[in-house]
Amino acid sequence: MNYVFSTEKTKRYRFPTHINDLVMDRSEATSSEVFVVVLAPGEAPPLHQHDDTEQIFYVLSGQGRLEIGTESQPFPVAPGDVVRIPPATPHRIHCVGETSLTYLAVDCFPSGRPQAEPTWDSHVKAVCAVQGWEYEQVVEAKGGAIK
């Protein structure tokens, strides 16, 4: 069982809208997972929600704009900010600066690890199916090699 995970040795997933570097797979924990998100200037993932997940983001670098729920005004995010996304809440973050927006994301599963998607790869395959993305193109060209 692993207790310490390196942010230097990650598996990279390059979605059409952002990068996720997997730090701790949900299969290695009871009810959480950890990854680093990188958005290039102008990038934003699609508006989406996670019905079974509460997310916590810690902004490491860059500038962003959070759209969340039914809020009419977006929220600015900057290094040092912590963002909370409640379960079943539509959200997305835009990179609005001239440099990449990078944040550490911790997904917490209040009901335990999702049975339908027990690993990060199974989750990525489901996301790709919903968005119409090719899984093989999302996994880093080097086969998801450790960076």
Name each model-derived stretch.
Residues 19, 43, 52-53, 71, ...:
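A generic "binding-loop/recognition-motif" signal
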Residues 44-46, 65, 73, 83, ...:
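Histidine-centered metal-chelating micro-motifs
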Residues 35-51:
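Conserved short histidine dyad/triad with adjacent acidic residue
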Residues 1-32, 46, 118-147:
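A short, N-terminal "cap"/entry segment at the start of jelly-roll beta-barrel domains
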